[in-house]
Amino acid sequence: MQQPPPPPPPLLVPVHVLRQSVVLPTGEDANEWLAANLADFYNHCNLLYGSLTQFCTPETCPTMSAGPHFDYLWTDSTLFKKPIRLSAPEYIDALLTSIQMALDDESVFPTKPARPFPKNFQGTVVKQAFKRLFRVYAHMWHAHYGALAALGEEAHFWTSLRHFVLFGKEFGLLEKKDFAPMEGVCEW
């Protein structure tokens, strides 16, 4: 069993700046703010995970997990209507692809001012994306923290994760149970 990683290194951005950066600016539409930030967090997570793809293979990570007690099954509304066990890289690819498809879908993420966001935007679309992206962070922490450290990406990882968690908590996008794989780590 893998040893828990050491305490996080200093962040690249001070915590008070991260806390300020997640607050909805006065006069900003909440859905626009959620959409813009989800796109940014998707890109951050994708970049971090992308640096680990040589270490995260179907052989090294035959299931999508975050430690010994958290295995995740994939389901979606098109290909996998029943939950299915995928390797971590397959799960993460499906997850990132589904978020990218949603980001590109005008009916979900409208780019024209006159077009409204769907009624279930925050409660379903954004919340599900956040829950699943957190699983990627948890997988990286549990399964690939050594590789992150060897690549010199620890500060990037912790800054990205903390920003993500602060935003998720600010808007109620992550629940206490979502943090279970990183219990005690995300207490910000």
Which residue ranges define each predicted feature?
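Extended alpha-helical interaction segments
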Residues: 1-117, 168-171, 176-179
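A sequence-level detector of short, solvent-exposed, charge-rich linear segments
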Residues: 57, 64, 114, 148, ...
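Conserved, folded interaction/cargo-binding domains in eukaryotic regulatory proteins
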Residues: 118-164
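Eukaryote-biased recognition of C-terminal alpha-helical segments
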Residues: 154-188
